[in-house]
């Protein structure tokens, strides 16, 4: 846990806890959040220590339907995962290299070319973890651009005197302490060395290092992963509420009304969680959470639920329908494995007025989606309307 709190500087310049990178690594490479009972921090730490073992483990997810990649790297056509080593021949040549130039140059790549590009990114990401090049945990003293470097880059970045000695020795000492700790079950030395690295980061990287509160918030955000769980909670509440609302239309009972109101409250609580998750992303990233495809989808889902709760006075069907649509929108984000990574804001989007403009435009899709599902529900109710229940149907 302490190792996961250390800060790294990613390729885009964002400062984030190692815990965030390790979560992204597993999610992007293997479409999973853990491996064989190991959490993401343990997997990443193990990779940096035992790279020769991990290159043999089938971890890289290969999309189904593209057998050409499986054929090129030499794995079974039914295999879902490939080991890192399979992407290279005996001479160390990258097997996908002949196909990537055309894929990256294509103005409108086909699905096969997209799969090549996606797989290449997974291989590169895993290579950065295995080699330790992503482990940029050392801030360069007095660097005007606030550059942080990895252990591999330590000799070319102006570390002098005791700082140079420290950067050269601290990671080997830490890995040695981990090995000793695995035998003795005493991790005190390893924890002390992590605190030492943490102190080095605070001393030379304080200007760009996130506050302890932000680190806590980001690790909690990664741990609970509320947005990934919300679609299942939303759809469960929506379906039950929908059933009880329909039954209550035909058989008015006090317990049915109480049950419907209870699910209404549950949906409201889920919306509160949804809102808190968006606020957390805003706080962690430092900018409004609608700056990429994933955030836009999550925000559209939020606006759908917001308008559903705002117009719930006359009919509880509005709330149930809104929760159902919200669940479908959120599921779309995760079913397509859209990257949920928190990233730095692109300079072109760094505008107060543009932020408001995008918020209004994107939120407008919520009422459109809500109107669609309510129209469908209204048609269903009209279909079942007769002279006996016409009055009740009109009220709903």
Regions found by a protein language model. Give the residues of each.
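Generic detector of multi-pass transmembrane helix bundles and their immediately adjacent loops
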Residues: 303-396
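Conserved hydrophobic/aromatic pocket- or pore-lining residues that grip, position, or stack substrates
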Residues: 197, 292, 357
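Short, glycine- and charge-enriched coil/turn segments that flank and shape catalytic ligand pockets
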Residues: 184-186, 250-256, 385-395
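Residue-level marker of motif borders
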Residues: 7-8, 287, 352
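Soluble extramembrane regions of membrane proteins in the secretory/endomembrane system
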Residues: 1-220
């Amino acid at each position: 846990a302490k190792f996961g709190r250390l800060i790294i500087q990613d390729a885009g310049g964002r400062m984030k806890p190692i815990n965030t990178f390790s979560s992204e690594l597993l999610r992007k490479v293997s479409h999973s959040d853990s491996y064989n009972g190991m959490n993401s921090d343990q997997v990443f730490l193990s990779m940096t220590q035992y790279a020769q073992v991990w290159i043999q483990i089938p971890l890289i997810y290969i999309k189904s339907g593209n057998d050409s990649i499986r054929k090129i790297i030499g794995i079974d056509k039914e295999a879902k995962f490939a080991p890192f080593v399979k992407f290279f021949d005996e001479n160390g040549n990258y097997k996908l290299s002949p196909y990537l130039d055309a894929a990256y140059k294509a103005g409108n790549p086909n699905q096969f070319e997209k799969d090549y590009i996606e797989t290449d990114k997974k291989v590169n990401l895993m290579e950065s973890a295995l080699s330790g090049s992503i482990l940029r945990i050392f801030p360069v003293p007095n660097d005007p651009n606030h550059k942080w470097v990895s252990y591999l880059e330590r000799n070319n970045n102006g570390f002098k005197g005791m700082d140079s000695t420290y950067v050269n020795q601290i990671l080997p000492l830490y890995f040695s302490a981990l090995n000793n700790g695995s035998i003795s079950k005493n991790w005190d030395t390893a924890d002390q060395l992590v605190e030492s690295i943490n102190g080095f980061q605070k001393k030379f990287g304080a200007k760009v290092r996130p506050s302890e509160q932000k680190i806590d918030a980001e690790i909690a955000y990664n741990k609970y992963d509320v947005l990934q769980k919300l679609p299942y909670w939303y759809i469960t509440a929506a379906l039950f509420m929908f059933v009880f609302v329909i039954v209550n239309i035909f058989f008015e009972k006090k317990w049915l009304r109480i049950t419907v109101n209870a699910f209404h409250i549950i949906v409201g609580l889920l919306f509160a969680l949804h809102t808190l998750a968006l606020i957390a992303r805003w706080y962690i990233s430092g900018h409004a959470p609608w700056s990429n495809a994933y955030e836009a989808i999550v925000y559209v889902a939020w606006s759908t639920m917001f308008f559903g709760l705002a117009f719930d006075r006359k009919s509880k069907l509005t709330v149930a329908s809104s929760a159902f649509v919200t669940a479908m929108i959120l599921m779309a984000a995760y079913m397509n494995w859209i990257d949920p990574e928190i990233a730095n804001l692109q300079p072109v989007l760094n505008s107060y007025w543009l932020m408001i403009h995008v918020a209004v435009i994107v939120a407008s899709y919520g009422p459109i989606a809500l109107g669609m599902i309510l129209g469908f529900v209204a048609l269903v109710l009209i279909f079942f309307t007769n002279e006996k229940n016409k009055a009740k149907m009109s009220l709903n």
